[in-house]
Amino acid sequence: MTQNGETCLPDYRRGAKMAVLAGDPTKKGLFTVRLQAPAGYKVPPHTHPTAENITVISGTFNVGTGDKFDEAAGKSLEAGGFVVMPAEMKHYAWSTGDAIIQIHGKGPFQIKYVNPADDPRNAKK
């Protein structure tokens, strides 16, 4: 795990910046991270093996459920908004403007993309 101004988890899409506040999301146990998502940032449909708890710190962050990315079916969360994505629930997210979110949960934090082609770990180098 590195924090180089981009992301500290290789399974997140590039463009966002992440800071670990507590714990280690790559290891067993509780963790809390903050993610700064720039305008236009999108996370395609995916799941996690454990619940994901998201709090919007600033800006507007959008989430939706299902195996297809559909902004019309999503929900906008303003600063102070909170949502829990249960383990294995297919969901996606995006920001139209700059947003900062806090994610907390139980590690190890893993992402499984519905479409393997969306997984940045599968990108050609």
Task: Give the role of each language-model region.
Residues 26, 38-40, 88, 98, ...:
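Solvent-exposed coil/turn segments that connect beta secondary-structure elements
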Residues 20, 45, 54-55, 83-85, ...:
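Structural recognition of the beta-strand scaffold that forms the well-ordered cores
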Residues 38-41, 47-68:
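Glycine- and acidic-residue-biased ligand/ion/polar-headgroup-sensing regions
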Residues 1-31, 118-125:
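A short, N-terminal "cap"/entry segment at the start of jelly-roll beta-barrel domains
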Residues 24, 40, 61, 67-88:
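Short acidic-glycine-tyrosine-enriched beta hairpin
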Residues 72-75, 92-125:
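Double-stranded beta-helix
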Residues 13-16, 28-30, 49-51, 88, ...:
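Extracytoplasmic
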